[in-house]
Amino acid sequence: MKISIPTAKEMNTDLPYIEALPLREESQAVLDSLAHYSASELESFYKVSAEKAEEEYAHIQTLKDQSAKHYPALKLFDGLMYRHIKRDKLTEAEQAYLKDHVLITSALYGVVPALSPMAPHRLDFLMKLKVAGKTLKSHWKSAYDEALQDEDLIFSLLSSEFETVFSKEIREKMVTFKFMEDKAGQLKIHSTISKKARGAFLTALIEGQVQTVEQARKLRFAGFDYRPDLSSDLELVFVKQV
């Protein structure tokens, strides 16, 4: 059983760094494509300010010359979902669960264990980067599939941009999750609710050592309860009363 989560744009490098691993072939090809851009070209590629583009240019160059500092991926990313994941003061059992079951999907590193070393970088599958003439999604599809092909049960906490990198065969094995708020009988869903809830849900999976769909259905976390009337076999819906 594996749980897949996406990367985030926000990062925190105020952490002890760890030893890097050699870049896999697919990652090196992506890096080589990024390295073709000048700082001013990155400004329009990333749709960011000149200052931010310079920062990203520096990140790419340090990756290229192998001087980049690396951090455990789960702690490096600091978006809303990540800030709601229990990442510190884990018990031995929780550490082991994280190591055995949680994978991060990245447009630069591929599908990797949650505590794998990663360097700060900015890349997602909505960006129009060509790698050897292919889109990022096409470039990664076979490696993404390979990472999960032997799994019978996959919990996906991915956004659609990451989920659709996988082939239909893999996606059909995924159990997905929807998190909603019930305000005076009106069910609402938006990205802030979803991101916070994904982090809280992953924390509940880790703390509960969840291995099955049946166990996941029984979870209560951050005010959310499972709603069988809104769920299906492959989509579990959790609702919070507000």
Which functions belong to the PLM regions below?
Residues K2-K89:
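Active-site helix-to-loop segments that bind/position phosphate- or nucleotide-bearing substrates
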Residues K86-D233, V237-V242:
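Internal, well-folded beta-alpha domain core
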